[in-house]
Amino acid sequence: MSMAREELAERVRALLPPRVHCLEKRMFGSIAFMRNGNMLVAPLKDGSMLARVGKEGMDDALARGASIMDMNGRSMSGFVLLSGDMVEDDDALSEWLQRCLLFVDTLPQK
């Protein structure tokens, strides 16, 4: 696993609130943090992060500088890509984790 991805994964683990239980699952050549069977975030090899904000959260996330998540030429609805700069400090990363948790906690458990 790349150093940037592992460092970001460690920060995600440290910043998730204690009450939040997430499982870690290998996906996208990375570690995806899963909440109740739904993907929350996934740190990527270049230090960027896949984040699940939901369709309703897309416009706000894009306005804040996120990009549409594209996998093999297809956009992933409800998911955005956060550049490494967007999650560089713990306050920013924590804010994005909270946004993702607010959405993912509305989804049915899988």
Question: What are the roles of these predicted feature ranges?
Answer:
Residues 1-110:
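Charge-dense, helix-prone N-terminal extensions
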